[in-house]
Amino acid sequence: MAGSLPPCVVDCGTGYTKLGYAGNTEPQFIIPSCIAIRESAKVVDQAQRRVLRGVDDLDFFIGDEAIDKPTYATKWPIRHGIVEDWDLMERFMEQVVFKYLRAEPEDHYFLMTEPPLNTPENREYLAEIMFESFNVPGLYIAVQAVLALAASWTSRQVGERTLTGIVIDSGDGVTHVIPVAEGYVIGSCIKHIPIAGRDITYFIQQLLREREVGIPPEQSLETAKAIKEKYCYICPDIVREFAKYDVDPRKWIKQYTGINAINQKKFIIDVGYERFLGPEIFFHPEFANPDFMESISDVVDEVIQSCPIDVRRPLYKNVVLSGGSTMFRDFGRRLQRDLKRVVDARLKLSQELSGGRIKPKPVEVQVVTHHMQRYAVWFGGSMLASTPEFFQVCHTKKDYEEYGPSICRHNPVFGVMS
């Protein structure tokens, strides 16, 4: 039975969890990764909380329902991509499986995703939950970066299918730059950038607040988020962009209409410089975070330069974008231009230092954008879980009972040949 039904693919992120069945192009559900629980009057530690489990255990909500429950305590079990509270995560998964996917877990193989540099212990915890609590027949824990690379095969820019590339995964909570060679993550070279979707939202909120436009204070964050998603884009040159707005403001300034949640009256805001200043913090992080000065193109270049020399050219040739915060218009084009400038400057310098005797071979820089970018990790999982090889590489319940949770510490790479 388990082999005949499609595997379930669950991608748990800091902000949102994407879930659905393998073989589909988009996840069936995208829900906030939060859980609303009734907190008892007594503050107890985790060990006691396990003892006190009972009726309270069933009284919880996840996703959008959790956000709409003001009388409950809303918790986010995942921070910066890593699961921090496994008790809450188990309850979260319970509703994911039974309420959203409406699946009988004994009948479906599961593909779960994990962030880069996840600890082997965390894989074991996940295996325990899936095999012990849900009794799944098979589990595969895939690295998000590898799935994002697989998803990029749908792009017209990609000639041959390869699992060598550099993944820029930018979600709500964190942006990672992850080099992958032949399907294996080069862990020592990963870098993270403390700028992601949430920071852009906060920055836009701050810009709007400074202008003192008539936004109700309790709605300022959601208004900033809506403006970010609807109107923001990446500009090629920030000085020219300011000039463009000053010359013809009517053409470029947009209007956002919102409704005051308390008195139901409309409010209208002009959205001007915020449109390009928001996402610009990827390339000029000092605008929002004075402690971090490196642009995303410099970080990508540094990561590639720290990798083994024989994979550097293939990495420059396959820079793959993944996650909702890479969806801004012209993000890929600007990144490719800036990265090419850095690389060309280095080649020019080496030529000058050699007195013109050495002419370096030009480096091809290509940033791959594709229409599956927003849910790239989930879609890559959906693709790979649809292949016959998936069932061969899955860790089965039988293996788990024989060897224990340590089998899930290692998950073989597959899918290059398919």
Swiss-Prot record:
Citing just one GO molecular function, the answer is: ATP binding
Instruction: Tell me the SMART domains matching this sequence.
Output: ACTIN
Keyword Cytoplasm recorded: yes
Coiled-coil intervals, chain numbering: none
* PROSITE patterns documented for this protein: ACTINS_ACT_LIKE
UniProt keywords (A-Z) are: Actin-binding, ATP-binding, Cell projection, Cytoplasm, Cytoskeleton, Nucleotide-binding
Q: Name one GO cellular component term.
A: cytoplasm
Q: Supply the SUPFAM superfamilies for this chain.
A: Actin-like ATPase domain
Task: Kindly list the places in or outside the cell where this protein is found, as annotated in its UniProt entry.
Answer: Cytoplasm, Cytoskeleton; Cell projection
Q: Output the InterPro entries linked to this UniProt entry.
A: Actin (IPR004000), Actin/actin-like_CS (IPR020902), ATPase_NBD (IPR043129)
Q: Where is the signal peptide?
A: none
* Nucleotide-binding recorded as keyword: yes
Q: How does it assemble?
A: Interacts with the Arp2/3 complex composed of ARP2, ARP3, ARPC1B, ARPC1B/p41-ARC, ARPC2/p34-ARC, ARPC3/p21-ARC, ARPC4/p20-ARC and ARPC5/p16-ARC.
Q: What is the recorded function of this protein according to its Swiss-Prot or TrEMBL entry?
A: Plays a role in the organization of the actin cytoskeleton. May function as ATP-binding component of the Arp2/3 complex which is involved in regulation of actin polymerization and together with an activating nucleation-promoting factor (NPF) mediates the formation of branched actin networks. May decrease the metastatic potential of tumors.
The family annotation for this protein states: Belongs to the actin family. ARP3 subfamily.
Q: What is this protein called?
A: Actin-related protein 3B
